[in-house]
């Protein structure tokens, strides 16, 4: 069959190191035959072994979603609330500090922090940016050594728009205050027709790209992500991967690729009906992980599944499909869990290592930037120790 010849030719070219095209990636993503998918899996697994070996990394971190009050209305989001709506919350700085202290006491090396978009944090005559700088200081003043992985491109763009500041100014001030890296979320699918249906109030593809590249120029590394398994096609996914690879070749600022399969149990009825399922399809997610590994090649070597969305067993299976990282402990998670995910909100380092062992690989602890670390705690400042007594 012609398609089998094309499949072998595409995989052979990837194995030889030729850069995969967007149409080739779409072709692989469209494979439904189990035998064809196994060929893709095997090719991705071989490339993973060649690029990063047999060891699998994990990070001890805590996720803090500091507020769910948000002015935007993304069609898939069950997390956001209006300010006066039941269930709306905004953590005060003392609560955020408490969560950080608990994480540090548990050996965390990273705090990941994101929240809703709330113009009311501006205060009387102040800047929205000032609130975010205070958030950063609440963590970094007592814990200067903790790695702060905070604020998506959408959050940075929101601050710049509200305060009428250049995005470069916002990013520079956040970095100077203590933000060490950023989550590359709010990407969803970087294809405008899809974005207009899925999240029309979010920043555009072009604005996302410009914000990300500005962050990289500012010295802020970032994860890269894709929200898959909703209204997009195989070609849309491939186009998205192409946008990410183009950025990576220009800046080298992405640390990893994380696939975020759509969870829609609590999504609006119209979107649920259109997608036709509420939980991720594991086989589809695994194929996408494998194609991403082949597509990025040497330009982006760290690949992570989402155990929150796939469950730890599914994430462990992804280690056979090109992934070399099992993710973080998180300690808590609200955005995906409120959407109806069944993967849980917290994992212990022991559970992550066990999942890696189950996949017949060796686990090691890393930091946010994929440097191996020894298990250690970050000691709080003396003032915090005194306050805790």
Curated annotation (Swiss-Prot):
PROSITE patterns the UniProt entry points to: RADICAL_SAM (PS51918)
InterPro entries: Aldolase_TIM, CofH/MnqC-like_C, CofH_family, F420, FO_synthase_su2, rSAM
Protein name: 5-amino-6-(D-ribitylamino)uracil--L-tyrosine 4-hydroxyphenyl transferase
Organism: Gloeobacter violaceus (strain ATCC 29082 / PCC 7421)
Gene that encodes it: cofH
Binding site for [4Fe-4S] cluster: 70, 74, 77
Keyword S-adenosyl-L-methionine in record: yes
EC number: 2.5.1.147
Pathway where it operates: Cofactor biosynthesis; coenzyme F0 biosynthesis
GO molecular function, one term: 4 iron, 4 sulfur cluster binding
